[in-house]
């Protein structure tokens, strides 16, 4: 059994380079919600150094709220913004002798696309326009995955180690009680259950089916590196390999 382990990079976290040694895929901020040309280039170089798959992490142009506030943009505007961000990172990766492998939207863009077919379509079309070989990463069982499949993209269904789930398979919104899984032990148990059994227990107690192709690790917490090490150890004990391919 194998699973992809991904982390967001280029968002100002101090653990980026060390975290890359523990994951198989990196989602690099593309300058709208965080980062700039220099951080994008540095993140690409670190990913190549660690032999980690390079992914674009486009978001809304909303630095003030770190791309986490909902926005309602015309489809054409969103399409252009995603093409712009993904295309820029693709050029930087190729300039360093690397390759852009996947695209994972950030924050509110990710969460809105998970529920909004029109928004999900705009993202999928933008990704396909840049390179139809790119993998689209989205919340398991979401509109993002369905849009990717509609438009002929390879998709990767993602689950979260440290986030709580609603009974419909969506994430509990940040700021709501219980949104974050605070205990490392609980987060590891939840992750193993999602990977091995294809299900997760929602905040209200129901079991929800999920397909865990990739697991997101958040690198911005105070114990991010320690948790990543512990999760890798748990995978090793269970015979689960970490790989982006």
Swiss-Prot record:
GO terms for biological process: carbohydrate metabolic process. One of its GO terms (molecular function) is 5-oxoprolinase (ATP-hydrolyzing) activity. It catalyses: 5-oxo-L-proline + ATP + 2 H2O = L-glutamate + ADP + phosphate + H(+). The keyword Repeat does not apply. The keyword Lipid metabolism does not apply. InterPro entries: Glyco_hydro/deAcase_b/a-brl, LamB/YcsF/PxpA-like. It is an enzyme of class 3 (hydrolase). Pfam families: LamB_YcsF. Keywords: ATP-binding, Hydrolase, Nucleotide-binding. Its EC number is 3.5.2.9. Forms a complex composed of PxpA, PxpB and PxpC. Belongs to the LamB/PxpA family. Catalyzes the cleavage of 5-oxoproline to form L-glutamate coupled to the hydrolysis of ATP to ADP and inorganic phosphate. This is 5-oxoprolinase subunit A.
């Amino acid at each position: 059994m194998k699973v992809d382990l991904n982390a967001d990079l280029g968002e100002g976290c101090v653990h980026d380079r060390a975290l890359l040694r523990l994951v198989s895929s990196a989602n690099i901020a593309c300058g709208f919600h965080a980062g700039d040309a220099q951080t994008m280039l540095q993140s690409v170089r670190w990913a190549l150094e660690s032999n980690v798959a390079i992914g674009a992490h486009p978001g809304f142009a909303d630095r003030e709220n770190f791309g986490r506030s909902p926005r309602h943009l015309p489809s054409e505007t969103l399409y252009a913004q995603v093409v712009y961000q993904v295309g820029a990172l693709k050029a930087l990766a190729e300039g360093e002798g690397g390759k852009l492998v996947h695209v994972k939207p950030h924050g509110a863009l990710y969460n809105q696309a998970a529920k909004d077919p029109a928004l999900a379509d705009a993202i999928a079309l933008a990704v396909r326009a840049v390179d139809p070989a790119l993998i689209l990463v989205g919340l398991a069982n979401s509109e993002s995955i369905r849009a990717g499949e509609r438009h002929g993209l390879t998709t990767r269904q993602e689950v979260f180690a440290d986030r709580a789930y609603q009974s419909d398979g969506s994430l509990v919104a940040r700021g709501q009680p219980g949104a974050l899984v605070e205990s490392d032990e609980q987060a590891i148990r939840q992750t193993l259950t999602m990977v091995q059994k294809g299900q997760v227990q929602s905040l209200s107690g129901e079991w929800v089916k999920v397909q865990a192709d990739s697991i997101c690790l958040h690198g911005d917490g105070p114990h991010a590196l320690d948790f990543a090490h512990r999760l890798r150890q748990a995978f090793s004990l269970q015979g689960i390999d970490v790989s982006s391919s």
